[in-house]
Amino acid sequence: PGRNLRIQPYVLTSYDRYKNNTSITDPEKTAFRYGGDIKWAITPHSILDLTFNTDFAQADADRQVNNVTRFSVFFPERRQFFLENASLFGTGVAPSEDLSGGSMRIQPFFSRRIGLDDSGNPIPIDAGGRFVYRSAKNNIGAMLMHQQGSSIMPATDFFVGRFSHNLGRLNRIGGLVTARNNSQGHNIVSTLDGFFRLSESHQLNMMVS
């Protein structure tokens, strides 16, 4: 507590035994998995989070949806690591409650693209880190994650950086950069955004990406 440091390790073990199955070359198998998270409150305004062999076993499962459209279903983030400080990286334009402006959702950074495939199945994350600084005027965040390769996707690095500046109590301008890199290629997206409270009943939410 005196160092404002929290270390949370974990160890998982599994034992499988197959009987009366001659097609299996190893009828008994024991596996171990270990990892953990580290949270360091560097100052009252800044926090560093580190994770390796990240375990998302406690995350709630997605509800079952029959999707008959050609678009992906938008599921909310449920993993604790990505829920922390999610509001800092969550810039975008969401549809209005009455859908008067259409149902389109524009979100440059979507954390569910990390560690999950398109069907919501987990892909192991080897390691990652996140730094967040918050003050009355400025907010800064950066996150870097390394995802293991799978049968359908090579190992991939994800990065997101965010800066926002508060203009008074109700207005804000900011920028966001996201990057994704693997052996198949890379892409980078830059975003500028702003929020302005024009009156008690009117507000302006803008974004250029």
Where are these regions (language model features)?
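Membrane-embedded beta-strand positions in outer-membrane beta-barrel channels/transporters
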Residues: R6, Y10, G35-G36, G128-R130, ...
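Outer-membrane beta-barrel translocator domains and adjoining extracellular loop/strand segments
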Residues: K19-I24, D62-N66, G115, I152-P154, ...
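Outer-membrane beta-barrel translocator/channel fold
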Residues: Q58-P95, V177-S190, N205-S209
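Residue-level signature of outer-membrane beta-barrel architecture
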Residues: W40, T54, V132-S135, S164-L167, ...
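Flexible glycine-rich, low-complexity coil/linker segments exposed to the extracellular/periplasmic environment
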Residues: L83-P122
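Repeated loop/turn-to-beta-strand initiation elements of outer-membrane beta-barrel proteins
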Residues: L5, S46-L48, K137-A142, R169-G174, ...
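Residues that define the transmembrane beta-barrel architecture of outer-membrane proteins
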Residues: D26-Y34, I123-A127, R134, P154-F159, ...
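Transmembrane beta-strands of outer-membrane beta-barrel pores
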Residues: T13-R17, T54-Q58, S135-K137, L144-S150, ...
